[in-house]
Amino acid sequence: MPLDLQKIFTYPYDNDLLMRKQKSIRRALLAREGTGYIDKRIAVLCGSTTDDIKNVLELFLLEAGIRPQFYQSEYNKYYEDAVFGNSELDEFQPEIIVVFTSVVNILDAPTLGDSNDVVRDKHDAEMKRFTQIWEKLAARYPSAIIIQNNMELSYETGLGNLDTVESYGMTRFIELLNRSFSDYAATNDNFYLHDLHGLAARIGLSKWHDRFQYSAYKFAM
């Protein structure tokens, strides 16, 4: 039975189907007649395992008429590839660079009882590290677009509701770091944020909110 590409790429997406039928969907997309593709070289610098993300990204790009060629860093080698470079990445000459990091890549998170000054120093150290990544990439590949994830909230909050109040709370630290990422994006060309924080929240909120219940009974949650 042929795949219904229009249905597959109409929101809301069937995530299970996209994951299970990646190869079949890719073949069907490339077999479309009369489709002219724009070729793009995309480097994915990984802070975690990104194979499935890369594969699904390829499907959506192909559906949009973009045929990607990928460079993928080794696991958790995003910093080394960005700051020190390597010959394979240089030869690839990426047009788009995705720095795919998340909360697990924060190296020095606040700990219980850290003073305001210590927390600020930890924030500044993280920003210095990421700014170094962005500036090195921009200098080495000046025509490339850089896309950086911001940080989603940590799954566990050891301080409960105080996690967003105390300066050493992880939630407050992530919010501070995300604001700094946004400030950098607002003042630098060819640099864009991917709102991983918002995406994670929407996935969570989709399980929290029931629109039918609100429309029918005004239950807000």
Put a short name on every predicted segment:
Residues 1, 10, 14-17, 45, ...:
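Non-membrane alpha-helical secondary structure
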